Each structure stands twice: as structure tokens, then as C-alpha cells.
Amino acid sequence: MREVGQLKLETMLKARMNSQRFSLVLFFALISSLSAQVPEWIWHNQNAADDEVRYFRKEFPVSGTVAKATLTIAADNQVTAYLNGKKIVSNDNWGTPSRVDLTKEIKPGQNVLAAQAKNESGIAALMAKLVLTYADGKKATIVSDPTWVSSDKEAAGWAEPGFAAAGWAKPVSFGKLGVAPWGDVIAGGQASAPAGPAGQATPAAGLTVVDGFKVELLHSASQEEGSWISMAIDAKGRLIVSPQGDKQPLLRITLDPQGQVAKMEKIELPVWTAMGLLHAFDSLYVSGNGPQGTGLYRLRDTNGDDQYDQVDFLRKFEGGGGEHGSHALVLGPDQMIYYIHGNFVKVPSDLSPASQHKNYAEDQLLPRQEDGNGFGVGIKPPGSFVVRMDREGKTCELYASGMRNAYDFDFNAAGEMFTFDSDMEWDWGTPWYRPIRVYHLVSAGDYGFREGTGKFPDYYPDSLPPVVDIGVGSPTGVKFGTRSAFPAKYRKALFIMDWSYGRILAVHMTPAGASYTGMFENFVVGKPLNVTDLEFGKDGAMYFTTGGRGTQAGLYRVTFAGASTAPRSPSAEERKAEREAVAARALRHKLETFHGKVDSHAVDFAWPHLKSNDRWIRYAARLAIESQPVELWQKRALDERDVNASLTALLALARLGSKEVEDELIESLGRSWPDGMNEEQKLEALRASSLAYIRLGRPSTETSQEVIKSLDPLYPSASSRLNRELCQLLIYFEAPGVVRKTLGLLAKAETEEEQLLYMFHLRNARSGWSMEDRRTYFSWFNRDRAQDKHSDETVKWFRDAGRDYGDGASLPKFISNIRKDAVATLTDAERTELAPLIAGQKVVAKAVVQRSFVKDWKLDDFTSAFDQLNKGRSFEKGREAFAVAQCLACHRFGNEGGSTGPDITGAASRFNHRDLLETLVDPSKVVSDQYQNIVVTKKDGSDVTGRLVEESGDKIVLITNPLTGDRTTVSKQDIRKRDPSKISPMPEGLLTILSKEEILDLLAYIESGGKKDHAAFRSR
């Protein structure tokens, strides 16, 4: 990636060349010389392992007398430098490079600069710059860049001239000096990208991009232009962007032939806050707010003057406002409009009878719990969903559902649909946590999201799995590179955006049967890089926006600047695999034509495919059969002998059959159980039987006893997945011995998530307990959680996002609610005897020293002080200010804090200095609907303001004080209305008791993510 400053310099030199008739040779010599002045951060490989050691060398000639030689060198994390085999310096602080005078060490002829560098953890890199000043005043500069060579093995003489570096590799460059996360350490710059002045988006020089690509910052939005959240491209290649702010107009951006901003104009029509934009059918479709509230609007130019002049309101979606509301619009290959919605939106009541997706439900065998903090309380399935509509928005079909809160989606070149779904970050540390992930969205697909603890595990056959799990983050825009001018690998990639941790990732997919599997890599990374949406222009470049929640917005351009290479011809084996994948997808599409439609040919066509080894084919075939009257296929399902076909058909019958057939259904499920089934088939059988009990009711006593008899010998199993299902079923049937067996698994569980799973299910067991068992169970709540571990996969998800693991905000309350449910199963005598264990240990809050008022701080008080955040801040004073300002009372930070507000561990990835401080001094300027209070107006005229955490048929419960957790219950019969509050739950004036220096230390502490070795805390 080239720096913006250098690009401007090149432009200036070009102008000078034209005016003064510079020779082309001289011009490029100047550019080459200037480029060579800037060292790059390099490493042996892209992804460094913890504690790895790597070796680097660069040979260079010296001709003439050297009057001065100065080396500047640093490495993340340690480096020892050698000149001609002699050790010259060691450094273990990459934020403060070593400067060494080598004048006496340089010799005429060949010299070699070498370095041994060690990584501690995370990303690793080496930076070096050697400046030679000759006696005649001329200079030569040797910098770290990909012309060096590197090795992962130490060899005799490796640091000396003349060493044969056969087998040594070209290192990987992460970017030139100034790139995040290191910054310009030579000039003393900060580790994160510079924030720039007010109204300045993160400079392109602060971003890291895949080798061969270049990023440019085209425009930084002014306050009037707003904080951008969505983007579309019209038929003329112009970009249309939407600010998030209320009543801020949409903007249309015209690009010149070089991809630079030539014109920006407002769309002066009353539509705004567009979570989705689509230009199609000579119209601009807007998912946002307008004269008739939140819904789907269409803008048209009716007189041909190239200005939108008409607004049509097409359709309303109840609950469609906000960040969990109605989102992106995409034109499908069938020329239908597809529209994705978040989990707070209700499915339209006028769905077409031909909708592909039906028959979804909670489908929980044991009672689930709502979110511990009350988020999404009372929200019923189907979760986030996609509808398909005609261009007028009239015919509306439910296409797929069961995501959490997918924001955007796109179709690949083969016409397949994919989305990037969000996680519920408050679930971190629980067995029901689902990471952010990419889904292949197919007809009638259910992806298993249910609120609270009810998320389906990926192996449930009545749902579909992800293409790839990404980890932690906040998904925003997605787009395939199909229309890009990128190399073939990236034209096929799905680009996905993570707002929370400042990254655009490229997902590379491989066909797998009728679907795909995937791998991913970081494509563009920055801090902050609050990415929101992307498009590919007519020039094949990627254009992306930043913004959201009032943060600084910007428009960027990504182009491929590397050497083009001819695509590799696929092998015969690859061509065969591709043909098979195309055929599998074609079969799936044929089966999908029967979804939602009664067709006399459907059962006979689909039935043979119930036995397919491809899960996606079985799923499509089952849904084709479920769309037909049950009486046409019920007997066939009960009589089927092929294991795969039988399990799939009986799953359909469990979902749609009647109580009268239940015992026979369970008997048929046991036909090959267990010896005739592999693990996947056992899991399908267990889920099908659970669905029968959920939807058809508890079976007869005789059948129940037979079920216990068949399951009990298999529990516990060597498979954690089988144990998860067997545990629930045996508790459901109150099987003798299930409590003791489950406590045994609890004792052996290696991760907190697995322990919590067994604790969660055991809370439902009302019988089979001894007092010893009860003591074992309740003792778990009082254990030392510091000893608990998490899976390697979980730890990696956090590491990939550049942060440490932290408990989800709802985890403590989930645990508390599990204990409360378990206590409810005790007899009075048990409750008395176990009282000390049940009570546990009370946590006494540390007293906060009373502070005096200092000043009512404003944002302008700090405008000239942001450069003081670079270095020399105090970690201890920042942490103390964090406590004094009561931040931990409401916010998760690392693995501490409350849950009333958002987790701010990764705040530096999405907020620059100015945006972050603004949220502290003016918390009500932007209030996320995820943390928004409601104002309840009672019939007696009084108001109650707080966060809704519980709702039942006759009452609601609000947290009215986020600092103390005080709750107020309001009877529904007393409520006249309820409205969203425009006032942030975060109290104003929290910084008024801090000095300016303390506030700067506080900002540095938050931006560090709680890491003491952050560059901001290094000495000046």
C-alpha cells in the first residue's frame, strides 16, 4: 500500500515534469528514490506464531568514504541487529526504536545488515532504516522491505557477508512506516492510525491492505454530511450514500474517470436513515424513514431531469426501525427484490401463500431462558429473515430465516445468496454463543437462531450450518468481487465488513456438494476503521464507506496495483469437482421449485433424494415433501427402510404429523438405533424424536419407558454432541441416574462453556437428586472462575479481532438465573440445608473516593490535545479514572464490568479520539437502539424511564438506574403509551470530576483495550 502523501507528491512531480520537460527517466528515478526512503514493516510470513524467532539479512555495497552511518531499528516484539556478523544493538520496545551510530563499522565493498527477531504473541514485524552519508554529501538509504531475505532457521555465518542464502525467502510486507498498528515510530507517532482533525476520516496511510492492493481516502464527511451507514450505485456509476442521522438527506456522489470525487449533491426528498439502498428498475429503493414512518420507499425521476422528484411508500414492516430492523435490498438474478430484516422485525401478515418458508417454531425440548439482560425479551421466531418481492413491493414471500441480525447480503456469479450474520456478544462464554458467520441462504432455509438460550447447534437437521465461522465483531456490508477488476481469486471472494474491529475480510469459498465451505483473510484493516458498506464501481475498484452511530464517515477506494498474472488452468480433477458441484446445485434448485407449492409430482420426485449424503439436498427434498399434504406421504415415511431417507422423512413427520402417529413415529426412529447409525445419523434421530415430543407432546408411558431404555446405556458418550442431546432427553423423561451421570460429565468438562451446558440442563431435573448431588451442583456457582478455560477456537476468535477474551455482558445473569431456576426445584428442607451454598459469596463494591467538581468539559476543550495521546500517558491513572467515572458500572471492558452499556474493549477499532471523547461528554448525541431506554407514560400522567428487561402478559420490568440496577415493575393495565427515550442511559457529567490530564489518560486507557504495553503508555 502506498501512502497518500507520496501519491500527492507523485502528482506534483508529474505536473513539474510537464511544465519543465523533465525526462521520463529522471522522473521515475526520483519516484524510486523517494519510495526507497520509507522502511516497511516486514516478517517472514503473514501469520506469526507465538514465541517464534525469524532471521533477516540485507546485503548492500559501499563505494567511497562514509562520513556518517545511522541505523534505526525496532521489531514487534524483540530484535538483535548485526552488521557484518558483529552484534550492534538489541531492542525489545517496538514503540521506541534503537538509533545506533555505525560510522566506524561500515567498510568499503559489500556489507550485510542482519537481524534476529522474536515474536511474543499476535502480529509480528521488523522495521529498519540505515542512512549512509558520504564525504561528498551524497546519501544512500537501506530500508526493510521485500528485497530482504528471511529464514525460520539459524545457520552458521547467516549474519556475515558472503553467506549463501539459498532457500531463504522473500519476507511479507505489512505496509510502510506509519501503518497501523505500529504507526510512525521513528517520528514518535501513535500506534493506531492518526485521527486527523475534526471531520477527517482515518488516513489511508494508517490502513493495512493485502499485498498488491492500494487504498485511497477519497473524502472525509463533514458534520453536515453525516455519519454514513449504507451505499448503492446507480446506472451511471454514481454512489448514493445515506447518513444515519434523522432528517439528514441522502447524498449522490459523482466520480471522475480516475475514481476521485468530482461532485457531491443532496437528494432533497423526505427519506433518510437508510439501512438499505438499491438502484433498480430506474428507481432508488430505500429501506429507511420517511413521511409514513419506517418502511420501504421508492424514489423516481419522473421528468427526466436526472433528479429524483417522486417518493412512493411501498410497504411497512412492523418493528423495521433501528439497527435490528429492516436492512439491505438486493436485486436477485430472477429480477425479484430480496429484502433482509433483523430479529426485531415481524413477518408481514400478508405473506404470499406460495412462500417457501413455513412451519418454523421455537422447538425447545427443555425450557429456554430469555437473555440475562432482557435484550430481545418476548421476540418470537423466525429471527432475522429474507423476503422476496416484486418491483412494486406487493407480492411478498418469506424466503429464509433463522439468522440473528444479518445486515447485508449478495449473490455470487452462480446466483447463490450469502449473508454475514451477527453474533449476540452478550452470550460470550456460554454454550449457546454463535460467532459472526457467513451463511449460504437457500430456499426455505432455517439457520437456527432463537432468542436467549435457544440457539440451535449447527448439527440440527432442521436447520442449516454456516459456510464459515469468523469470530467476534459487528457485521455490516457485504459484496462479491464479481464486478471488480481484481485478480481472479478476489473476483470470486465475498468481501465482508466488521464495524466493531475495523476490518474488511475476504472469504474464499470452495463448492461442497450443493453448498460451499469457506476460508477467510484480512483484506483491509485499520484502527479506527468503522466500515459500513461497499460497492464496486464501473472502473472495477472497490469503494467503501465508514461511519455509523455518529462516528466520522469517509469514502475510500481500493484498487489492484500489483502485477497481473494469467489465471491457472484448473486440473482435470478440479473440473470434475466443479461439474459435480454445478449438478448438485441444479438438483437442489429443482427440489426448491416445490417449496411452498402443492404439486402432485413433488413427493415422487423428492423422495429418492431423502437418502442423499448431501445435507443440503436432503434438506431441500424434505421441504419439498413438507409442502405437500401429510396424508400423501405419512405411511411412506413410517415404512421407509433406508437410514438417511427414514430419518429425514420422520423429521418431516415430527414437524407436521399428528399426535395419533407419535408412538409409531418413535418406533420407526428406533428401527436402526443405535448400531445401524453413524454419529451424524444418531444426532438426526435424537433431534427428530425431540421434535416429536415438542410438537406432538409427551408420548405414552410405555413408549417413554422404551425410549429411556434405549438411550440410557449410551449416556455418557465419547461424543460431546451426543451427550448434549442425550442429557436433555433423559432429563425430559426423568430417567433414573441422569443427574449423577451429568454431574460426572460436569466434573470432567474442560471448558466453562461445556460446564455451563450441563448446569443449564440440570436446573430442570426435579427428581433423582441426593443431598451430595445437590451440594456438588450448587458448589459450582461458588468456584474460582479464574481457573476456567475456553476452547482454542473461542480464544482464536478474540485474538483474530485483536483483543483478549471477555465474558459476555449477560453471562453473570444467565448464571444467576440458572441458580434461581435450580433453587425453585428444591424442597423446603433442601433449601434450608443448602442455604449457605445457595447464598454464595457476596461481592462488596470497592468504595469510590468522593471527588470535587472540576469543570463541565466540552469537546472543544480537547481539540488541540489529541496529539498528547500518542505517548507518555499513564496506564495506572487511566485505570483509576475509569473507575472514578464509574465506567465499569455499565460497560464491559476486558473481562470486567456491567452490561447496561456496550462492550468498549475494542472501541479504538471503530472510534477515533474525537468520536470517543464525544460519546463521553455528550452521551445522548447518538443512542444505539440496542441500549436505548423507553419512556412509559402511565394513565395517571406519571412517567417511568428505564431499560426493558422483562415483559409478560400483564407487566413489564424496567431497570431505572443503570449504576445501581434498581428495577421498577409496571402493570400493563396502567400504561397509556411507551416511547423510545432520546436521552442516553449513560448519565451526563461523569467527566466533570476529572482533570484534563486524567481524561486524556482515561481515553488512552480505553483505546488500549486495557493493555499496559500499548504505545500510548510508553515514555515520550
Per-range role (PLM):
Residues S23-S33:
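Bacterial N-terminal signal peptides
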Residues Q37-A48, P108-A191:
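An acidic-aromatic loop/edge-strand motif
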Residues F60-L83, L113-A115, W168:
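Aromatic-lined ligand-binding clefts that engage carbohydrates, nucleic acids, or primary amines
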Residues A193-T593, Q841, A845, F893-N895, ...:
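Beta-propeller domains with acidic blade repeats across secreted/periplasmic ectodomains
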Residues A541, E880-N895, D903-G906, N912-D922, ...:
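C-type cytochrome heme c attachment motif
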Residues G547, T551, F560-A881, T900, ...:
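Long, ordered, helix-rich scaffold segments
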